[in-house]
Amino acid sequence: MGAKSMRSWCLCQICSCGSDYCPYEIVKQPRHVPEEYKPKQGKIDLGTTYKRDLNSYKVQPVAIVRPLERQVKKGKLDTVPTYKDDYRAWDLHKSELYKPEQTYHPPTVKFGNSTTFQDDFVPQEIKPRQSFKPSSVVKRSTAPFNGITSHRLDYIPHQLELKFERPKEVYKPTDQRFEDLTTHRCDFQGLIGETAKLCRPVHTRVTQNALFEGSTEFRESFQPWEIPPPEVKKVPEYVPPTGSMLLNSTSHLDYVPYQANHVVPIRPVSQKRSNNFPFQGKSIMKEDFPAWESCRQGLIKKQQQIPNPSGKFDGLSTFRSHYVPHELIPTESCKPLNIAFKSSVPFDDVTMYSVEYTPKRQEICPASYPSPPGYIFDNTNSQGHKFFRKIIPAVKAF
């Protein structure tokens, strides 16, 4: 009990309204080390359910259902449908009206312009009710305005310390090698393997005073060789032939002429028409597909079992023949009379809320006081948090 009473409490722990909040230090979360990837052993099964469950079938060509020979019927085509033959129009007669003739007689009395609502409504005097709403008039106080706030009362001015001016540091480049490590390189490190061997030849630095050789690998591998001069062929002197030139060719000497006949054309000779009658216009289509000799089809309608009525149509229905008119009796109105209810008893303005409401005591946050009741100021830490200590009640000695 003594150790608990000696403990100091921060102002944010004493506060009950949550206005005084002290930030706490952020604890860094532990870093998750990823596990090393280990590839699975064995081969991948590339089989699928489609390859396993598929059963192939032999596909055969579809047999032709269309008949080989075409049957052409002769006769004229009947374009009259069965609807027009079976359902013919009836001779309709206009039915007489059964509504009684009523001649309108205008009223002789002058129209009063009064409705049933105006006749039944009794005007009543409206009495204004007593208003329980508080008045909106602002009451000005005569006392002077007290502009002292809790901030002005509790504020303690402190003397500002002189700012420490840090001297400007001269930049000195480091001798150590720059480590360009990132979070990705730290977290995802590669597997340890053998270092790659350089295939690049050793770079020999050329001194400035040495002359540039200008030799390449191609020049060293393919060196020039001596080409012997071409041999000059001696051209013999031109000796012209003796005698005259023969202009006969092998075609002139070996050619034998033949007597060939003209080709007879296969196309028939066009003969001009000597007749004067008009063009018939016959074609293979018209000769193969002549007009059908069609006959009118008989009625497919069944014979009527019920005989048709004879005589004039009465137009009476079962409702009209059995209907008996009755006199209308007006229903009695059960609506209460619209008369204001007057009572001499005063109005009882007591509600369930005013009866059952229990006012609660408004608690004041202890942190709003300059020194919370029941606590003694202890100290202030480096972050500016105030700490208080509970007052131990005095125990009377017997």
UniProtKB/Swiss-Prot annotation:
Region described as Mn 2: 148-162
GO annotation, cellular component aspect: axonemal microtubule; centriole; ciliary basal body; cytoskeleton; sperm flagellum
Stretches the record annotates as Mn 1: 114-126
Region: Mn 6, residue numbers: 350-364
Chain residue ranges for the region called Mn 4: 282-296
Domain of life of the source: Eukaryota
Gene Ontology molecular function: microtubule binding
Region Mn 5, annotated ranges: 316-328
Region annotation Mn 3: where it falls in the sequence: 248-260
Family per similarity comment: Belongs to the FAM154 family.
Cross-referenced PANTHER family: STABILIZER OF AXONEMAL MICROTUBULES 2
Name used for this protein in its record: Stabilizer of axonemal microtubules 2
Organism: Homo sapiens (Human)
